[in-house]
Amino acid sequence: MTSSTSPETPSDPSQTRYKRVMLKISGEALMGDQGFGLHPPTVKRIAHEIKTVHDMGVEICMVIGGGNIFRGLSGAAQGMERTTADYMGMLATVMNALGMQAALEGLGVFTRVISAIRMDEVAEPYIRRRAVRHLEKKRVCIFAAGTGNPYFTTDTAATLRANEMACEAIFMGKNGVDGVYDKDPALHDDAVRYDEISYDEVLAKRLKVMDASAIALARDNNLPLIVFSLDTAGGFRGILAGEGTYTKVQG
């Protein structure tokens, strides 16, 4: 499916669908065609997509996974203590957050990295009221180190912070897929994309959108989830302007 062309970019948030949003992307999204780490041109491209939305006047929160560097579950599966592996994964998210901060500020977007684990030399500690103030000053807030606790994914961290920051929706940017499908479109040519689906259906059908804890937290707080493709230039901005291809999960 192809997305329609975006209209002229709105100059203020009153002309967009949402005024404050949470953007969740995986660490793997920063790898580009590499097998590990950060690919600077890819990070810069994603930063540019974020800047175009920031320029619309939208207040942006962000959570980035750490799977391009280390994934806690994988470490635990190989015999590492789960708690230690999860903390290592949290540190990986801080590295990704700093990389994205550098890319955004290189484009002139003021940014704050806010860590759930104190590391004052590189990031601010998480204080909700301070983070809200950053958003009001039009700074992008990148929340790092998950929730600060093992056994919780970055999907859950994104949903938690979205609720705490009073975001109006979570935008989940995906690679290679433009929404939620009834089965894996990479393996099944007859896979069908949902335009809209409820959280209960996602859980009942075991669709791989977010982990169950994150889905329950979003559902119980009436927080919609927009799943879209990060690969489409202008896709993030287009959806906020009311266009594009995506799946909306709510209810």
UniProtKB/Swiss-Prot annotation:
Keyword annotations: Allosteric enzyme, ATP-binding, Cytoplasm, Kinase, Nucleotide-binding, Pyrimidine biosynthesis, Transferase
Gene3D superfamilies: Acetylglutamate kinase-like
Record GO cellular component, one term: cytoplasm
Residues at which ATP binds: K24, I25, S26, G27, G67, R71, N175, Y181, D184
Principal localisation: cytoplasm
EC number(s) on file: 2.7.4.22
Entry similarity comment: Belongs to the UMP kinase family.
Subunit structure: Homohexamer.
Protein name per its UniProtKB record: Uridylate kinase
Organism, scientific name: Ruegeria pomeroyi (strain ATCC 700808 / DSM 15171 / DSS-3)
Lineage: Bacteria, Pseudomonadati, Pseudomonadota, Alphaproteobacteria, Rhodobacterales
Gene name per UniProt: pyrH
